[in-house]
Curated annotation (Swiss-Prot):
Its EC number is 1.17.7.1. HAMAP family: IspG (MF_00159). Residues 1-39 form a transit peptide. Its main location: plastid. This is 4-hydroxy-3-methylbut-2-en-1-yl diphosphate synthase (ferredoxin), chloroplastic. Homodimer. It catalyses: (2E)-4-hydroxy-3-methylbut-2-enyl diphosphate + 2 oxidized [2Fe-2S]-[ferredoxin] + H2O = 2-C-methyl-D-erythritol 2,4-cyclic diphosphate + 2 reduced [2Fe-2S]-[ferredoxin] + H(+). It comes from the Eukaryota. One of its GO terms (molecular function) is iron ion binding. Binds 1 [4Fe-4S] cluster per subunit. [4Fe-4S] cluster binds at residues 648, 651, 682, 689. It comes from Oryza sativa subsp. japonica (Rice). The gene is ISPG. It is found in: Plastid, Chloroplast stroma. Keywords: 4Fe-4S, Chloroplast, Iron, Iron-sulfur, Isoprene biosynthesis, Metal-binding, Oxidoreductase, Plastid, Transit peptide.
Length: 744
């Protein structure tokens, strides 16, 4: 980190001669030791900005302080309620003739992929998007020629009776923004590159005067656009991207959510200084965990500042297909469950009109949750970390003396996948083993990298069904857990099975009818009374908990009930692993299943709450449910079982056919778990936006590709025809390549 002066104090902290004070009533937590993450100088003494070990929020310490004295740090409010989904109150921002804010529906939008200079093609694309039901359409405007074309685009659409508001996407071009503000309804600016130079990822040092001069430069460059938007009644989005922060911001705050927030606040303060309030914020990242943290931190700051500006939600470079939908659902859905978000965009490497349907499904999910106003009884939340990730430590199964089978593999340390298996599947054991993604050797199953960890069998085969029982024995022998209801285990006992019990059965003592030492899995909803939850304290053989609320049930908010359950477990020192179990209704739409799982389970896993997932849907393919489960864990940055792709959705800047190239690269590299590859259409969303990708394939010029290792370019100007092979060779050169598995 650079040494200098903090550009602005944390808004919830007031420094006094006698120590530290807080400007509002807050909930406090004690911190005994605080590792500094940023050192800044001031005329009032030394200030350390650090991370609270219990809350994840920023805290401050002033010298002198007695050695070892605890700090009091605030737990910041970041949403209206932690007990239910209650939409955050935001002001109305007018985008053309469409109002945006909490008094209005969640707006949906996308972005064109055509060359903006091609007026006819862009108009056609906007019309297709509008016909699908989008509220806004964003168009890239990178230069004067594109800005001039925008006037013709707008006029042509109006002549065709398409009055959908148009948004100009601006990078590096303040003069272009001024021009297009005369015809488009909204201007998106990226604080990381609107006035600052392109990031070189350099460590910079600033004095107080240096930093102030940088802020004055930003104000000088940005103010004319603010005045132009006021003059023409335009809206604005101050849209920070995790991967395109300026060197100045990164030198102070790192490549972090805090840096994203501060970057946006610098621009917002200029807007407010000029009495311009028709703007929204966004905090996008390709990593859903980072994205969620940044939005929450921004809202916490707005609560402290008394601001009520709306939020545009999005996970940038989400990718394509179910992967892209899942990643978007985790990030956007988590925030919608918190009541945050006024407009959303699902960024997919697909035709832009294809983004509208998943976007609408997500918006409906958030609206439905807020309209129901269901939750749980108020409880005191002390342990969940809102602003940074630290996974709760669930105790994996330990081997007990005298046990004949190894239970240590029934759950995976990085996140577990459980699947529901039917009796019919036991009739074809080898097919079942393959469905569970087990590796077969002479017909015998063995666990592999992405093998299901445990299965739920609601009905056991008859004791005399030797073939079915042998199939189950072979699964138990490879440390795959077999969960079955207590009633089944009592009437048709399966050796070494894990009995599934509910709270009533625990209360009645029915589980004591099982042989001593039988392992248990307990199903809970999360809204049980504390007296019922106390039953967990007296049972020694609990291997895991299943948090299970039927999907679509309107009596309990799943996310909030789970948070209450985890708070109880942490408060009472109970470290049972918790599996998130969702049973979807029949005929559920696939996109609804992916989005529902991503939003409801992702909202917990991004906070480190949970140890695995069990998805059930009677009429969905077994392999689809299995793959969706693994995608969910990987999207939450837990268990990595396949290649991770950071793939931009394409826009008018894109220098090659992203969908075609992305498909080619995936076909040849999808078998590399632990490897992350960025596929970026241009340099604007290139090195910075690649975030933590290991390798990058980036459009550098028409027909030419640049290859990156991390954020460093290592090869330039490779012809498109050989670029994919060059990427593979680069992966090999860095020792990350393995040959694809041979089909049996």
């Amino acid at each position: 980190m650079a040494t200098g002066v903090a550009p602005a104090p944390l808004p919830h902290v007031r420094v006094r001669d006698g120590g530290i004070g807080f400007t509002r009533s807050v909930d406090f937590a004690k911190i005994l030791s605080v590792p500094a993450t940023l050192r800044v100088g001031s005329s009032r003494g030394r200030v350390l900005v650090a991370k609270s070990s219990s809350t994840g929020s920023d805290t401050m310490e002033l010298e002198p302080s007695s050695e070892g004295s605890p700090l009091l740090v605030p737990r910041q409010k970041y949403c209206e309620s932690i007990y239910e989904t209650r939409r955050r109150k935001t002001r109305t921002v007018m985008v053309g003739n469409v109002p945006l804010g909490s008094d209005h529906p969640i707006r949906i939008q996308t972005m064109t992929t055509s060359d903006t200079k091609d007026v006819a093609k862009t108009v056609e694309e906007v019309m297709r998007i509008a016909d699908k039901g989008a509220d806004f359409v964003r168009i890239t405007v990178q230069g004067r020629k594109e800005a001039d074309a925008c006037f013709e685009i707008k006029n042509t659409l109006v002549q065709k009776n398409y009055n959908i508001p148009l948004v100009a996407d601006i990078h590096f071009a303040p003069t272009v923004a001024l021009r297009v503000a005369e015809c488009f309804d909204k201007i998106r600016v990226n604080p990381g590159n609107f006035a600052d130079r392109r990031a070189q990822f350099e460590q910079l040092e600033y004095t107080e005067d240096d930093y102030q001069k940088e802020l004055e430069h930003i104000e000088k460059v940005f103010s004319p656009l603010v005045e132009k938007c006021k003059q023409y009644g335009r809206a604005m989005r101050i849209g920070t991207n995790h991967g395109s922060l300026s060197d100045r911001i990164m030198s102070y705050y790192g490549d972090s959510p805090r840096g994203m927030v501060e970057s946006a606040l610098e621009f917002a303060r200029i807007c407010r200084k000029l009495d311009f309030h028709n703007f929204v914020f966004s905090m996008k990242a390709s990593n859903p965990v980072i994205m969620v943290q940044a939005y929450r931190l921004l809202v916490a700051e707005m609560y402290n500042l008394g601001w009520d500006y709306p939020l545009h939600l999005g996970v940038t470079e989400a990718g394509e297909g179910e992967d892209g939908r899942m990643k978007s659902a985790i990030g956007i859905g988590t925030l919608l469950m918190d009541g945050l978000g006024d407009t959303i965009r699902v960024s997919l490497t697909e035709p832009p009109e294809e983004e509208i349907d998943p976007c609408r499904r997500l918006a409906n999910l958030g609206t439905h949750a807020a309209d129901l106003q269901i939750g749980v009884a108020p409880f005191e939340e002390k342990h969940r970390r809102y602003f940074d990730f630290q996974r709760r430590s669930g105790q994996l199964p330990l081997q007990k003396e005298g046990e004949e089978v190894d239970y240590r593999g029934v759950l995976h340390r990085d996140g577990s996948v459980l699947m529901s298996v039917s009796l019919d599947q036991l009739k074809a054991p080898e097919l079942l083993y393959r469905s569970l993604a087990a590796k077969l050797v002479v017909g015998m199953p063995f666990k592999d990298l992405a093998t299901v960890d445990s299965i739920l069998l609601r009905e056991l085969p008859p004791v005399e069904d030797a073939q079915a029982r042998l199939a189950l024995k072979r699964l138990v022998d490879i440390s795959m857990g077999v969960l079955t209801p207590l009633s089944e285990q009592l009437t048709k006992p399966l050796p070494h099975a894990i009995a599934l019990v509910n709270v009533d059965e625990l209360s009645s003592g029915a589980h004591k009818l099982l042989p001593e030492g039988t392992r248990l899995a307990v199903t809970l909803r999360g809204d049980e009374s504390y007296e019922q939850l106390d039953l967990l304290k007296g049972v020694d053989d609990i291997t895991m908990l299943l948090h299970s609320v039927p999907y679509g049930e309107e009596k309990t908010g799943r996310v909030h009930a789970a948070r209450r359950l985890f708070e109880y477990l942490e408060t009472n020192g109970l470290n049972f692993p918790v599996i998130h179990h969702i049973e979807f209704p029949k005929s559920v739409n696939r996109d609804d299943l992916v989005i529902g799982a991503g939003a409801n389970v992702g909202a917990l896993l991004v906070d480190g709450l949970g140890d695995g997932v069990l998805l059930e849907a009677a009429d969905q393919e077994f392999e689809f449910l299995r793959d969706t489960s693994f995608n969910l864990l990987q999207g939450c940055r837990m268990r990595n079982t396949k290649t991770e792709y950071v793939s931009c959705p394409s826009c008018g800047r894109t220098l090659f056919d992203l969908q075609e190239v992305s498909a080619q690269i995936r076909e040849k590299t999808s078998h590399l778990p632990g490897v992350s590859i960025a596929i970026m259409g241009c340099i604007v969303n290139g090195p910075g936006e690649m975030a933590d990708a290991d390798f990058g394939y980036v459009g550098g010029a028409p027909g030419k590709i640049d290859l990156y290792v991390g954020k460093t370019v290592v090869q330039r100007g490779i012809a498109m025809e050989g670029a994919t092979d060059a990427l593979i060779q680069l992966i090999k050169d860095h020792g990350r390549w393995v040959d694809p598995p041979v089909e049996e």
